Amino acid sequence: MASATLTAWIKMPSFLKKILKLRGRRQEEESRSRMLSDSSMLSCRVNQLTSEGTEAGSTTPSTLPKDQALPIEPKVRAKEKSQHRRPKIIDQVRRVESLGEQASQRQKHMLETLINKIYTGPLGEELVQTLYLRIWAMEETPESLKIPQMREDIRDQVLKMKTERWLRTLIRGEKTKLKDFQKRYEEVHPYLMKEKVEQVIMEEAWSLAAHIVQE
């Protein structure tokens, strides 16, 4: 059959051969063009999918702008921890020492005058003698046994300082009134029930400061 086709091709006029050759060449070009077009479309589609995948992917923290950077968690925790940190002991001491400074001007003057008399005048000597006798006669506790064993000058100084602390605790704030005075005593009452020596000293401070409180 192939020989018959070849024989027919040989017998075919030359102009017809040219037409067939041109047609065959055109078909080959059209086929090659379609293949290139399909390949180009496929490449574009792949590039599009790759681009979409990149845009949809997560961005690493290092590529974020500075104003959108992720917060540093350890610093946040450290800040929260510092906000809940307990006050230092020295801060508590300073707060107690400044209680008397918060009183009204008149009460502050009377309070400082009273404290000065305790440290320098006969009132202080009378106070420490009264406190010593009351502590000596009270029910024995570790603190009540320790105070009589102190050297006399040290014991007197300790009792005066404890009295001053209670005076500044009771007389503070904007013009202390009798109801405030009573309320402050009630605040410290649970503590005084456990510390009997402090209760005796506070009661003497109460007695000394009563005239400062305004009705």
Curated annotation (Swiss-Prot):
Residues 12-34, 51-71 are annotated as: Disordered. The different products prevent the establishment of cellular antiviral state by blocking the interferon-alpha/beta (IFN-alpha/beta) and IFN-gamma signaling pathways. They inhibit IFN-alpha/beta induced tyrosine phosphorylation of STAT1 and STAT2. Blocking the IFN-alpha/beta pathway requires binding to STAT1 in the cytoplasm. They inhibit IFN-gamma induced serine phosphorylation of STAT1. Block the IFN-gamma pathway by binding to and stabilizing the parallel form of the STAT1 dimer, further inducing high-molecular-weight complex formation and inhibition of transcription by IFN-gamma. The C protein is found in virion at a ratio of approximately 40 molecules per virion, presumably associated with the nucleocapsid. Belongs to the respirovirus protein C family. This is Protein C'. InterPro entries: Paramyxo_C. The different isoforms interact (via C-terminus) with unphosphorylated and phosphorylated human STAT1 (via N-terminus), favoring the formation of parallel STAT1 homodimers. The different isoforms do not interact with host STAT2. C protein interacts with L protein; this interaction has an inhibitory effect on viral transcription and replication. It comes from Sendai virus (strain Fushimi). The keyword Lipoprotein does not apply. Residues 51-65 have a biased composition (Polar residues). The disordered region at the N-terminus is involved in C protein self-degradation in trans. This self-degradation of C protein may play a role in the regulation of viral RNA synthesis. The disordered region at the N-terminus is also involved in the host STAT1 degradation in order to counteract the host innate antiviral response. It comes from the Viruses. The gene is P/V/C. Keywords: Host cytoplasm, Host-virus interaction, Inhibition of host innate immune response by virus, Inhibition of host interferon signaling pathway by virus, Inhibition of host STAT1 by virus, Inhibition of host STAT2 by virus, Interferon antiviral system evasion, Viral immunoevasion. Y1 and Y2 proteins are produced not only by alternative initiation, but also by proteolytic cleavage of C'. Only alternative initiation is detected in vitro, whereas in vivo cleavage seems to be predominant. Disulfide bonds: none annotated. Pfam families: Paramyxo_C (PF01692). Residues 15-22 are annotated as: Involved in self-degradation and in host STAT1 degradation. GO terms for cellular component: host cell cytoplasm. GO terms for biological process: symbiont-mediated suppression of host innate immune response; symbiont-mediated suppression of host JAK-STAT cascade via inhibition of STAT1 activity; symbiont-mediated suppression of host JAK-STAT cascade via inhibition of STAT2 activity; symbiont-mediated suppression of host type I interferon-mediated signaling pathway.
